[in-house]
UniProtKB/Swiss-Prot annotation:
Residues 21-80, 133-159, 230-256, 329-347 are extracellular. It is found in: Cell membrane. This is Endothelin-1 receptor. Disulfide bonds join C158-C239. Residues 103-112, 182-205, 279-306, 373-426 are cytoplasmic. GO terms for cellular component: cell periphery; nuclear membrane; plasma membrane; T-tubule. PROSITE patterns: G_PROTEIN_RECEP_F1_1, G_PROTEIN_RECEP_F1_2. The keyword Cell membrane applies. Belongs to the G-protein coupled receptor 1 family. Endothelin receptor subfamily. EDNRA sub-subfamily. The keyword Protein transport does not apply. GO terms for biological process: adenylate cyclase-inhibiting G protein-coupled receptor signaling pathway; angiogenesis; aorta development; artery smooth muscle contraction; atrial cardiac muscle tissue development; axon extension; axon guidance; axonogenesis involved in innervation. The lineage of its organism: Eukaryota, Metazoa, Chordata, Craniata, Vertebrata. It comes from Rattus norvegicus (Rat). Pfam families: 7tm_1. Glycans are attached at N29, N62.
């Protein structure tokens, strides 16, 4: 609880400092620009904005430049504060929801199994993003500049911020793929029954997911630097992707397609493939001789499969608008078009919506589990309302993978014993 209070205090101080700094230094021009706001893990500085220019894109002496919009983009200050309120809500819900989800899986031994371990890994990645990246995003949006942009700590944040963003999304994507594979493996190996615990193969998968996510995020930490530039007679520094090598130039050129293909399409394709195979397995089992004996067994696993499928669908809905805006910027936007500034205003608005939806994905998974899974719903109610229920009853939760636990009210019978019958999910 002390840690949560510290994080909340840090968050409020950072946002408050951003509002004060914005009023003093950026009320004239920069308050309505969000060009250095990173809309996606690792997005470069000039993704949608064209007004604030890095040094190598400075205006020539005649004042003309391709891609430069003389007028401000049509994003009002009110919209920024609306976005800030949304981000604060996501911060609170995401921190409480993901922390509670981790606590549930950690404290209840019967919840420690393969799929729940992957869900815990997913929640931890979301929690890291919510706690570290969201405050920086809000500060940039309100202050119009990078936090601590004139000292070494700002340089450290410039490296850490895109690295953790990309790592968090990678952890989400790879965990969703692993959950899809796990559901197919559970249905295909219906006859294998194990005790409560995390299988070794699942532990290896989780470690591999985190290592691979960190490796794929290394180019972000290498490429992002603090770059000084001049805008309307004022000196500024911001964090942006500055390609200085051939590899980084190639990475910057193909980055949008790489993000769309690996970080969006791959989990959807993986889910489609393994859920199709899982459906075929279930249809074959319906005609088998053990249909009656396995009906309850398969029913429980189908419920878990629906939960995982729900998480994948939510991921797709949250991230599609942002990826769409990136692809439109890559394919439709033309620096030579006279109407490019109107298009940029539309893309910037679309990008704001995409940012909020993508960020919402970091807090919505615990909510989805609460409504989709009865087991997790009981756990959340017991954990969040423990003070209210402590004197009335002792809630015992059922793991996702089909364990059925019989329990009675502690006041009615203090000698109640629990019997657990676990169906393996792996």
């Amino acid at each position: 609880m002390g840690v949560l209070c510290f994080l909340a205090s840090f968050w409020l101080a950072l946002v408050g400092g951003a509002i004060a700094d914005n009023a003093e230094r950026y009320s004239a021009n920069l308050s309505s620009h969000v060009e250095d706001f990173t809309p996606f893990p690792g997005t470069e500085f000039n993704f949608l904005g064209t007004t604030l220019q890095p040094p190598n894109l400075a205006l020539p002496s005649n004042g003309s430049m391709h891609g430069y919009c003389p007028q401000q983009t049509k994003i009002t200050t009110a919209f920024k504060y609306i976005n800030t309120v949304i981000s604060c809500t996501i911060f609170i819900v995401g921190m409480v929801g993901n922390a509670t989800l981790l606590r549930i899986i950690y404290q209840n031994k019967c919840m420690r199994n393969g799929p729940n371990a992957l869900i815990a890994s997913l929640a931890l990645g979301d929690l890291i993003y919510v706690v570290i990246d969201l405050p920086i995003n809000v500060f940039k949006l309100l202050a119009g500049r990078w936090p601590f942009d004139h000292n070494d700590f700002g340089v450290f944040l410039c490296k850490l911020f895109p690295f953790l963003q990309k790592s968090s999304v990678g952890i989400t994507v790879l965990n969703l793929c692993a959950l899809s594979v796990d559901r197919y493996r559970a249905v295909a190996s219906w006859s294998r029954v194990q005790g409560i615990g995390i299988p070794l193969i699942t532990a290896i998968e989780i470690v591999s997911i985190w290592i691979l996510s960190f490796i794929l995020a290394i180019p972000e930490a290498i490429g992002f630097v603090m770059v000084p530039f001049e805008y309307k007679g004022e000196q500024h520094r911001t964090c942006m992707l500055n390609a200085t090598t051939k590899f980084m130039e190639f990475y910057q050129d193909v980055k949008d397609w790489w993000l769309f293909g690996f970080y969006f399409c791959m989990p959807l394709v993986c889910t489609a493939i393994f859920y199709t195979l899982m459906t075929c397995e279930m249809l074959n089992r319906r005609n088998g001789s053990l249909r009656i004996a396995l009906s309850e067994h398969l029913k429980q696993r189908r419920e878990v499969a629906k939960t995982v499928f729900c998480l994948v669908v939510i991921f797709a809905l949250c991230w599609f608008p942002l990826h769409l805006s990136r692809i439109l910027k890559k394919t439709v936007y033309d620096e030579m078009d006279k109407n490019r500034c109107e298009l940029l205003s539309f893309l910037l608005l679309m990008d704001y919506i995409g940012i909020n939806l993508a960020t919402m994905n970091s807090c919505i998974n615990p909510i989805a589990l609460y409504f989709v899974s009865k087991k997790f719903k009981n756990c959340f109610q017991s954990c969040l309302c423990c003070c209210c229920h402590q004197s009335k009853s002792l809630m015992t939760s059922v793991p996702m993978n089909g364990t059925s636990i019989q329990w009675k009210n502690q006041e009615q019978n203090h000698n109640t014993e629990r019997s657990s019958h676990k169906d393996s999910m792996n």
